[in-house]
Regions:
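Canonical Radical SAM [4Fe-4S] cluster-binding loop centered on the CxxxCxxC motif
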Residues: 1-36
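Radical SAM enzyme [4Fe-4S]-AdoMet core and its adjacent flexible, acidic
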Residues: 123-243, 248-252, 260-270
Length: 373
């Protein structure tokens, strides 16, 4: 099956101002995607791909309003025949309510809330206890809510509070290190070092592995464990070689590699320029991006034992680090310490592992190697 992931930003407007937002330097461009352009996007995605992952992103995508998503699903459903669609939305949660949740669940759509931890931990997103209470309320009513958080210097020593919250309310969680761009570009109050990151992982990892009630995805620990013990790269963007199977489309139809902060030299044209979205991968700027990424991957493959797991890392991180052709030091240092740490932990403590999510993952993907665990 031919697969593509599309991050669709129907608006870049936002109703809050997160202090470290990687879009802060774009000043939250005003404008909203028309339903006509949305239909054009869906048609041009459907031409060449039969396995489509579509994530509504932003800005804050729920600012588009309920009626937009009713029409959006009508359009998507017209193109679902003989194709596999995975649809989600990444929202700050302020406007998420039961009405939206019902619409999303009816259409097989998952919602993920940007959330940096309960109580005061989440004040970095300017949404305080309001969002914590909303998550608790929606989960109590049976709605599936995933969480996406950002690790900064302000919360890295308190990840256990975040972990316990997700366990208590049954939310899958992914934590990303803060991006060195936008509001956090030069702010040492937010940026963390790889040493900080590794120390936090090492502290929480044994607790997570031995927790028999932790039946939920908890990234980055889930992905690092998947890679270390199954010896394959994890199915998340920065480790799966996203070129050429990942695009971001803004509200005006502009196309970039992904929704992160990319300079104009990597602009890939406009959806209006193409009859088929796959043509964006023929753009000269994409060829330059691919050329630089190949140089980086060749370097990594020749010099690192972990290339098969990280695939040379994230293009955007290398660009922000100053050179697309070289790996970003943060993730490299993390990999070289965390992967052997997990392998050693398993060798010495596998009898203590009680985490049902981990045990099921190993049995499911371990080709029989872990069936007796």
């Amino acid at each position: 099956m031919k697969h593509i992931t599309v991050l669709l930003k129907p608006t870049e407007e936002c109703n809050i101002r997160c202090e470290y937002c990687y879009h802060a330097d774009t000043q939250y461009t005003k404008g909203r995607m028309s339903i006509e352009m949305f239909e054009e996007v869906i048609e041009k995605i459907s031409h060449s791909y039969d396995h489509i992952t579509l994530t509504f992103h932003g800005g804050e995508p729920l600012l588009m309003g309920y009626d937009f998503y009713v029409k959006a699903f009508e359009i998507i459903n017209k193109h679902r025949k003989d194709k596999e669609w995975h649809i989600s939305i990444q929202t700050n949660g302020i406007l998420l309510d039961e009405k939206f949740c019902e619409l999303f669940e009816t259409n097989g759509f998952s919602a993920s809330i940007s959330f940096d931890g309960p109580g005061e931990l989440n004040q970095l997103r300017a949404s305080t206890e309001y969002l914590t209470n909303k998550i608790i309320d929606l989960r109590s009513k049976g709605y599936k809510i995933d969480l996406l958080g950002v690790i900064t210097k302000r919360n890295i020593l308190r990840l256990s509070e975040y972990y316990n919250f997700c366990k208590k309310y049954g939310c899958h969680l992914r934590l990303n290190p803060v991006s060195k761009s936008g509001g956090a570009k030069n702010d040492n109050d937010y940026l963390i070092t790889s040493e900080d990151y590794v120390a936090a992982i090492k502290e929480l990892f044994p607790v997570w592995m031995q927790d028999e009630t932790a039946d939920f995805i908890f990234d980055p620990l889930s992905s690092f464990t998947y890679m270390a013990l199954l010896d394959r790269h994890a199915p998340i963007c920065e480790y799966c070689g996203c070129l050429p199977k990942w695009l971001s489309i803004s509200c005006d139809g502009s196309i970039y590699q992904c929704s992160l902060s990319y300079p104009e030299e990597y602009y890939l044209g406009n959806i209006k320029d193409y009859t088929d979205i796959s043509q964006a991968f023929d753009h000269n700027n994409f060829r330059e991006l691919l050329k630089g990424a190949i140089q980086r991957r060749f370097h990594c493959k020749e010099s690192c034992d972990y290339y098969s797991l990280c695939q040379g890392g994230c293009n955007n991180e290398s660009i922000l680090n100053g050179d697309l052709t070289k790996p970003a030091g943060f993730k490299c240092k993390t990999f070289r310490i965390v992967i052997p740490f997990i392998k050693e932990y398993w060798e010495n403590h596998q009898g203590e592992v009680r985490n049902p999510h981990v045990l099921e993952m190993l049995k499911r993907f371990g080709d029989g190697k872990y069936n007796d665990k």
